[in-house]
Amino acid sequence: MTNIRIGQGYDVHQLTEGRKLILGGVEIPFEKGLLGHSDADALLHAVTDALLGAAGLGDIGSHFPDTAAEFKDADSRVLLRAAYQSVQAQGWQVVNVDTTVIAQKPKLAPHIPQMRANIAADLGIDISCVNIKGKTNEKLGYLGRMEGIEAQAAVLLVRI
């Protein structure tokens, strides 16, 4: 049996008026927020998918369906911690997390240190093991038109 595994996660949510913008568990001041059943934290959803995928446990939708009332407006940090408990129960531990958030606006750099701290705390790893890169889409496509925000994540697990 393999002692290391890598998982890849992806999420995208539409930007809309009347919602808070939450990424990496951080509320970011912006005129729009992400539309979703939960708090729509695309970054944490991508990390959660990467964790579950690496452990062979499906995806975020199979664990926390958007049709379930108990996950309406759910805090994605709570979902991430619950998913990681399932991963640990299978005998896996996170080595590192590398992510990319693609958003034309707002600028993410001022918020990245707190996002990293949140993810590190939720996974019980050192902040140096969490990386977040903020990118724009150079005004191309739906991301460039500020219709949504996309997140990608890679997670390395080791057998414990």
From Swiss-Prot:
Binds 1 divalent metal cation per subunit. Coiled coil: none annotated. A divalent metal cation binds at D11, H13, H45. GO terms for biological process: isopentenyl diphosphate biosynthetic process, methylerythritol 4-phosphate pathway; terpenoid biosynthetic process. 4-CDP-2-C-methyl-D-erythritol 2-phosphate binds at D11, V12, H13, H37, S38, D59, I60, G61, R145. GO terms for molecular function: 2-C-methyl-D-erythritol 2,4-cyclodiphosphate synthase activity; metal ion binding. It catalyses: 4-CDP-2-C-methyl-D-erythritol 2-phosphate = 2-C-methyl-D-erythritol 2,4-cyclic diphosphate + CMP. Homotrimer. Belongs to the IspF family. This is 2-C-methyl-D-erythritol 2,4-cyclodiphosphate synthase. It comes from Neisseria gonorrhoeae (strain ATCC 700825 / FA 1090).
